[in-house]
Structures are given as structure tokens and as C-alpha cells.
Curated annotation (Swiss-Prot):
Catalyzes the conversion of dethiobiotin (DTB) to biotin by the insertion of a sulfur atom into dethiobiotin via a radical-based mechanism. Belongs to the radical SAM superfamily. Biotin synthase family. It catalyses: (4R,5S)-dethiobiotin + (sulfur carrier)-SH + 2 reduced [2Fe-2S]-[ferredoxin] + 2 S-adenosyl-L-methionine = (sulfur carrier)-H + biotin + 2 5'-deoxyadenosine + 2 L-methionine + 2 oxidized [2Fe-2S]-[ferredoxin]. Binds 1 [4Fe-4S] cluster. The cluster is coordinated with 3 cysteines and an exchangeable S-adenosyl-L-methionine. Binds 1 [2Fe-2S] cluster. The cluster is coordinated with 3 cysteines and 1 arginine. [2Fe-2S] cluster binds at residues 126, 158, 218, 290. [4Fe-4S] cluster binds at residues 82, 86, 89. The keyword Metal-binding applies. GO terms for molecular function: 2 iron, 2 sulfur cluster binding; 4 iron, 4 sulfur cluster binding; biotin synthase activity; iron ion binding. Residues 67-295 form the Radical SAM core domain. Its EC number is 2.8.1.6. This is Biotin synthase. Homodimer. One of its GO terms (biological process) is biotin biosynthetic process. It comes from Prochlorococcus marinus (strain NATL1A).
Amino acid sequence: MTLINPNIQESNKLKFKDESYLDFNSINGGDIRHDWSSEEIKEILDLPLMDLLWRAQIVHRSYNPGYKVQLASLLSVKTGGCSEDCAYCPQSVHNETTVQPNPVIEVESVLDRARAAKDAGADRFCMGWAWREIKDGNAFDSMLEMVRGVRELGLEACVTAGMITDSQASRLAEAGLTAYNHNLDTSPEHYSKIISTRTYQDRLETLRRVRMAGITVCCGGIIGMGESVSDRASLLKVLATLDPHPESVPINALVAVEGTPMEDLSSIDPLEMVRMVATARVIMPKSRIRLSAGRQQLGREAQILCLQSGADSIFYGDTLLTTSNPEVEADRKLLADAGITANFS
């Protein structure tokens, strides 16, 4: 009895419009590309959904056998009062939202939250500061102390705090920082519609400094901000042509907040997030694809499809910076119902 379709090897090849091929068998064998074109990526995004899910799962199973998922916790250490004008963000001083500037949380309080996150099952603790850029001084010294404390707890430590200098990146590396998050948000073509106070090149320069310091890179974007599918492909192209690829790629869905310029935008179709996650997995096989903000509007079924097709991390806890997130118990049940194991490093 023949159990394996003899045509399966050939069906693992995807033919692009320019007559070139993407061989999924070579991806499984470790052939990691950094020369993707936007056109190729858009063709993957536009595949019939069943084909896309199947092909993404081929890659996902190869690099993540057993569907293990990392649980990460995120704390807003400095909330509100940011001078940037990001159109989606309730923490911007340019947007009239209910978020008020709050003082920086003290070091020991942050470490208490890190201990609680570890006790709840997280093994990565992320800390956010609503800043345009890091400035030297007491606040930065406290950040370094927090990083050291989180690492001493046995957790991975990630920081997101805006632009950074070479010296600051080096000091964070010396403190033991695991990862620095600095998202691109959207495509280069759509970027000017989202923010005017920081250039796309500023963001890429920050990523370069993080990489040069020996810190792993966490970089992704947001969908649902009025961009086209071509914009999504362009964003993924920028990420997938970085060499090496970002170790962590958070994929967010816009959470439209009253008082921001994007308050009236409709929620995305959940399957758009599934497509984005699956495509990211195909083109960045070794990266950790993080299912991030906007999970609540996806529903259980779409979240499970994301986990099946490429996501191998979720943010865990009832708040993501200033937006709501599923309750811990709900996430535990979701993972259990899907037969997914957490955690891994």
C-alpha cells in the first residue's frame, strides 16, 4: 500500500509569475533566503488560503516540531507623554485619548511584575518606555538595573524604548539584554501616512545599532492601518531581506483607539492576520513569529490557525502596554485545546 503521494515533492514547488520557483523542500533543508522581492511575497500572501496554510505548515513543522509556543509578558514601564505622532498610538501627545502620562515604574516594582509573570508561566519579560529615544541619566541607569534583575530571574529580557545610540546599545548588551524591539510598523511606501516625527531610515539605523551590539532584534509591524496587500508584502520584504532575519517578528493587528486618527478604522478580517503570519513563517523560517496586539478581535479559531501556520509566541497577560489582551486562563485553555506546548527558549 502506498502511503505517500509520489507527486508531493513536485507539489511542494511554487511557481511565480516570472517563471521562477520556490522549492519548499529546500526551505525545510535550511536554505534561508535574504533576497526576497515584494512581488514574490505578495504572490505568497495571495495564495488560495488552503495552499498557503499547507505550505506554511510544512515550514513550521520543520523548524518547530511539536508546535511549541513561547509565552512573553509585556509591561509598560513608562506610559504616555510620547512626543512621536504615530497615528495609531494612544500614548502620543499628539492624540487626544484617555491615556495620561504616568511616572516611570520603580525598579523593584518592575521586578515584582517580572516574578509574577514567571510564576504565571512566561519565560520572556518585555518592558516598554513611551519615549522617542533613550536618554542617558538616571532613567537609563534604572533600565539597566531592570534588565539585570530580569535576567537574574532566569527570564529573557526585551526592551522597547525608541531610538538608541551605539553606546547605549553596548551598555544594554553588557547588562544582559536578550532583545531590543523596534518595529517598522508598515511598508516604506505607506509609512508617511502613519508617522512624520521619525523616518523609516531612523528605524533601520536603530536596528543596525542593536545588531552591532550583539543584541537580538525584535522587529515587526501592524496591519489594518489602511495599507494595501502590496504594502504588507513590502513590509515583509524589508524584514526578510535583513541579514540575518530578525530573531523575533511581532505581527500586530490595529487596535483602533478613540482619540487617535485611526479610531474609525474597522477591524481586519481575522484571516488577513492568518495570511500575514503564514507568509512571515514561509519567508523567515527560523524567526520567532509573535502573535501580538489585536488578538482579542481575532477569535479562538483564527488564533489557532495562526499558531498552526507559523506563530510560535504569544504575549501573555491581560494588558499589552495600554490595550487589552486575553486573560491568562483563557490563553491556557486556548493552548490546551489546540494541543500546543508552552514554553521554549
